[in-house]
């Protein structure tokens, strides 16, 4: 019987993975561990592997997989910056991802957390906790219909996000290296700088690559409309985090919502309540009253989880049976 290892299993995924295995007559083994130099030897007798990595995969893993006859790694996220695609190709390993598993879920998160900032929820909560129930200018907001929203990256998720904002009556502008001119609700701009210069809300939906690395840094923040809010539900590396904190502290941004953080791998998805966090930048984010931090959960809905579980397993099985899959990256 074909055997697939399901690394990075969370409690809510296990039954889904095992049901898929039973339905497809595949022996699926679940493990809470991630694929690494320490766990790769577990794959000696397996035909395929799916995992959900967040940190960089060590280069030593690729030749090990090749030596065991494994031809693929099925990543259960849209992001794939944790893999060296050329090194994987050298060792005849196909890397796949899941480019679309519930774009509406991430779009809904992006809009809802932006609304928390626009409606001054962090300030309101602080005042209520202090038993200050007065109405005052620090908690006065503006309706979204009077705002301009910049969507940076107009793929499936960015497009879904922009459509929601258009439903509020907002003016929606966008930037993408490959514009989708069928998006009638959105006005494209030639550059990121041009897209954000008049935006009250900036929503990031770009992949992590050499062109987007620290795209939003001090130089980019110089182009931001004073008092704008920024939401990053894309990849952490898109933002230079110290520069973001500075932009919030000096009033360039009135607030930010961060669902992905460039150094998140050691913390996000783990319970760190009984340990010391040795990351002063992450602590600065968490402690900042005008920054909302969530642990990479924009995608987290029942629909998305099922699509990720089944998508990863389907991709692994496809490579095992046919030598390729529809979502291969190299």
Swiss-Prot record:
The active site is at residues 235, 264, 296. This is D-lactate dehydrogenase. Keywords: NAD, Oxidoreductase. It holds the Pfam family 2-Hacid_dh. It is an enzyme of class 1 (oxidoreductase). PROSITE patterns: D_2_HYDROXYACID_DH_1, D_2_HYDROXYACID_DH_2, D_2_HYDROXYACID_DH_3. Its EC number is 1.1.1.28. GO terms for molecular function: D-lactate dehydrogenase activity; NAD binding. NAD(+) binds at residues 156-157, 176, 206-207, 233-235, 259. It comes from Staphylococcus epidermidis (strain ATCC 35984 / DSM 28319 / BCRC 17069 / CCUG 31568 / BM 3577 / RP62A).
């Amino acid at each position: 019987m074909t055997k697939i290892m399901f690394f990075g299993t969370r409690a809510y995924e296990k039954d889904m993975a095992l049901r898929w295995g039973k339905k497809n007559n595949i022996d699926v083994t679940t493990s809470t561990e991630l694929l690494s130099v320490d766990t790769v030897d577990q794959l000696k007798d397996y035909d395929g592997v799916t995992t959900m990595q967040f940190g960089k995969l060590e280069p030593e893993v690729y030749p090990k997989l090749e030596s065991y006859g494994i031809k693929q790694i099925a990543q259960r996220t849209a992001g794939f910056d944790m893999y060296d695609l050329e090194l994987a190709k050298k060792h005849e390993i196909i890397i796949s991802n899941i480019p679309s598993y519930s774009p509406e879920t991430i779009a809904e998160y992006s809009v809802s957390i932006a609304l928390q900032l626009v409606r001054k929820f962090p300030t309101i909560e602080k005042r209520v906790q202090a038993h200050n129930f007065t109405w005052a200018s620090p908690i006065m907001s503006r309706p979204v219909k009077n705002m301009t929203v910049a969507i940076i990256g107009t793929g499936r998720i960015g497009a879904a996000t922009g459509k929601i904002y258009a439903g509020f009556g907002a003016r929606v502008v966008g930037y993408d290296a490959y514009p989708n001119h069928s998006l009638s609700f959105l006005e494209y701009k030639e550059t990121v700088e041009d897209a954000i210069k008049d935006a009250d809300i900036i929503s990031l939906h770009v992949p992590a690559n050499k062109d987007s690395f620290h795209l939003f840094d001090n130089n980019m923040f110089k182009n931001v409309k004073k008092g704008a809010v920024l939401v990053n539900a894309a990849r952490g590396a898109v933002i230079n985090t110290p520069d973001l904190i500075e932009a919030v502290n000096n009033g360039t941004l009135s607030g930010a919502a961060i669902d992905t953080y460039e150094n998140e791998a050691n913390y996000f998805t783990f319970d760190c309540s009984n340990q010391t966090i040795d990351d002063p930048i992450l602590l600065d984010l968490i402690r900042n009253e005008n920054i909302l931090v969530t642990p990479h959960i924009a995608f987290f809905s029942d629909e998305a989880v099922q699509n990720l579980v089944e998508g990863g397993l389907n991709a692994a099985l496809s490579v095992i049976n046919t030598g390729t899959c529809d979502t291969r990256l190299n």
